[in-house]
């Protein structure tokens, strides 16, 4: 079997990933033939977005196992898994996908067609992601009124998944149901995923979109120009605390102050049942150059100190609901998240 979407393409021997660093100006694919190359693509944000990272890692796992030469196959598998796992610490889908692949490995380690079984599992994961996103979209669209203006942050669209998207999936599904929707996309410094990726996706779909600077959101909310905020997630704790792109917490505080519903759209696989609250979620710190430079040009003084956390945590008291493929979760989050996980 093969896979071909805008975000990624699996040929059976390699994984091609749309280089999201070069969008919206250049549509170019990077071909990965080894698990190390997939790990590099994840680390360098050639591919990004929690669900997309997870599926890319699953295909990287397949490529790595195929490169096995001699010695203990289990030891080699653990090396491959570790190389992929240490790329980005916050997105739980990465570890969920690798653990799922490892489980299949141990269940079939003695089978002659082990590599084929692993490839089929990665493909199954990819196609499941598309269906999950469409279900998230359908569930979330019911919360969006006709004529709404939606504020979103970063990119939780088709580019952040195998296809369709989570937060943008909600917007897509609302539009597909006949609703008139307008979107304000935060530019999302420092990597500009909103300006570069979200705007690009929505324009291709013919959905009305405005790019705004991150610090405009409060002004727009106060003027009554935002009806709802819809964002994605990289990890959700058992109590509903949510890690997402840096700046999400600020939007949630502003939304709460202005009585605007704040929705998180994410697959159940983004919920980490081993973490009770957001205080336990590891936050990735990225290179200072992402802040001091923009478009390859330095915009800050030489030698200035920089903080560059890639994510922040929004506590559950600021979240109106979490939209998943299994349904919409409302407070009390810990109780209702446990119910969803049991479904």
From Swiss-Prot:
Its EC number is 5.3.1.23. Keywords: Amino-acid biosynthesis, Isomerase, Methionine biosynthesis. The record marks 154 as: Transition state stabilizer. The active site is at residue 234. InterPro entries: IF-2B-related, IF-M1Pi, IF_2B-like_C, Initiation_fac_2B_a/b/d, M1Pi_N, NagB/RpiA_transferase-like. GO terms for molecular function: S-methyl-5-thioribose-1-phosphate isomerase activity. GO terms for biological process: L-methionine salvage from methylthioadenosine. The keyword Amino-acid biosynthesis applies. It catalyses: 5-(methylsulfanyl)-alpha-D-ribose 1-phosphate = 5-(methylsulfanyl)-D-ribulose 1-phosphate. Transmembrane segments: none annotated. Disulfide bonds: none annotated. Substrate binds at residues 48-50, 88, 193, 244-245. Pathway: Amino-acid biosynthesis; L-methionine biosynthesis via salvage pathway; L-methionine from S-methyl-5-thio-alpha-D-ribose 1-phosphate: step 1/6. Belongs to the eIF-2B alpha/beta/delta subunits family. MtnA subfamily. NCBIfam families: eIF-2B_rel, PRK05720.1, salvage_mtnA. Catalyzes the interconversion of methylthioribose-1-phosphate (MTR-1-P) into methylthioribulose-1-phosphate (MTRu-1-P). This is Methylthioribose-1-phosphate isomerase. The lineage of its organism: Bacteria, Thermotogati, Thermotogota, Thermotogae, Thermotogales. The gene is mtnA.
